[in-house]
């Protein structure tokens, strides 16, 4: 009996490696499994362990997303011990095709295949068919990418947009900038719009108000804000959403993202209702004479758990991803 033809897709983070199989000409993820990276010496051990549980699948193609730079001949994970030469790894695994993409590039490509029920709309009209899309997401850092339609496919834009300068707009934000500038020298928006950035913002607001910080983890700040049990934590989360709105609006203007904005990452989906009620949308649109332009752009919060795997499946078949 012949085996079924599948491709292997992966989303490799610092802690976990997520794997799935996709059938030819399909984007449906099958046999999703999450493996702890620390349980394996390197990628090939994890892949072999995963495939050993699916002997019915014949796999000759693979695409994987990595939470680290992927240009060059060597993959060196930022937050775990895995490191390998690309050509050697492909030979060891015996794949005819093996594509490597950055994790946020995969996230951007994955938004093309997220089901409608996993998209939470936050204002705006309808996205323009074929127009550029912005994909942005606070998580461990601030990922910024885009999707531009070509003659054949959607081309992902790899950017370092999370490292643009933080531009304060009122006295409180100016004070935050001064405090963070003393600590970091240059202050990018990522110093505020990520997990550690939320903590930076909280500590700055505590310093402005002359109180000792009560929380030491970003999750503690979020929990206290949502429970309305800490005034400064609540103020922190509100300001986080407002600053994120301005930064997202700037990025949408730069890209011309009339196709819509897709908010990914692990932070915003944890408090969608708070986010929806925050000043995010107002600050997103607050661009003077460009207000109407931004007012029509829809913003979607992506709640799909495996967007990166969907993106790896897209990248494997996408002619714009090499």
From Swiss-Prot:
Gene3D superfamilies: 3.30.420.40, 3.40.367.20. InterPro entries: ATPase_NBD, Bacterial_glucokinase, Glucokinase. Keywords: ATP-binding, Cytoplasm, Glycolysis, Kinase, Nucleotide-binding, Transferase. GO terms for biological process: glycolytic process. Transmembrane segments: none annotated. It comes from the Bacteria. SUPFAM superfamilies: Actin-like ATPase domain. Its EC number is 2.7.1.2. It is found in: Cytoplasm. Disulfide bonds: none annotated. The keyword Transferase applies. It is an enzyme of class 2 (transferase). This is Glucokinase. ATP binds at residues 10-15. It catalyses: D-glucose + ATP = D-glucose 6-phosphate + ADP + H(+). One of its GO terms (cellular component) is cytosol. The gene is glk. It comes from Hahella chejuensis (strain KCTC 2396). The keyword Methyltransferase does not apply. GO terms for molecular function: ATP binding; D-glucose binding; glucokinase activity. Belongs to the bacterial glucokinase family.
């Amino acid at each position: 009996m012949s085996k079924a033809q599948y491709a292997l897709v992966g989303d490799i983070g610092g802690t976990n490696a997520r794997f799935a199989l996709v059938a030819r000409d399909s984007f449906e993820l099958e046999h999703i499994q999450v493996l702890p990276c620390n349980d394996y010496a390197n990628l090939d051990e994890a892949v072999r362990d995963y495939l050993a549980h699916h002997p019915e699948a014949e796999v000759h193609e693979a695409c994987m997303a990595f939470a680290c730079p992927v240009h060059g001949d060597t993959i060196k994970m930022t937050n775990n011990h895995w490191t390998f030469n690309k050509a050697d790894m492909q030979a060891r695994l015996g794949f005819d095709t093996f594509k490597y993409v950055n994790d946020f590039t995969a996230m951007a490509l994955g938004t093309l295949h997220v089901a409608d029920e996993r998209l939470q709309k936050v204002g705006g009209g309808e996205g323009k068919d074929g127009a550029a899309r912005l994909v942005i997401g606070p998580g461990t850092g601030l990922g910024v990418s885009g999707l531009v339609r070509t003659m054949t496919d959607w081309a992902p834009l790899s950017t370092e947009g999370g490292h643009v300068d933080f531009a304060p707009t009122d006295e409180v934000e100016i004070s935050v900038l001064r405090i963070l500038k003393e600590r970091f020298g240059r202050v990018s928006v990522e110093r505020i719009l990520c997990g550690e950035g939320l903590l930076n913002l909280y500590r700055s607001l505590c310093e402005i108000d002359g109180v000792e910080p009560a929380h030491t983890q970003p999750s503690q700040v979020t929990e206290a804000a949502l429970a309305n049990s800490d005034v400064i934590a609540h103020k922190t989360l509100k300001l986080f959403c407002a600053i994120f709105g301005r930064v997202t609006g700037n990025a949408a203007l730069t890209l011309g993202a009339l196709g819509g904005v897709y908010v990914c990452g692990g932070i915003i989906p944890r408090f969608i209702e708070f986010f929806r009620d925050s000043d995010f949308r107002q600050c997103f649109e607050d661009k003077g004479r460009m207000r109407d332009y931004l007012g029509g752009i829809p913003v979607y919060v992506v709640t799909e758990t495996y967007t990166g795997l969907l993106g790896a499946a897209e990248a494997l078949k996408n002619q714009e991803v090499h």
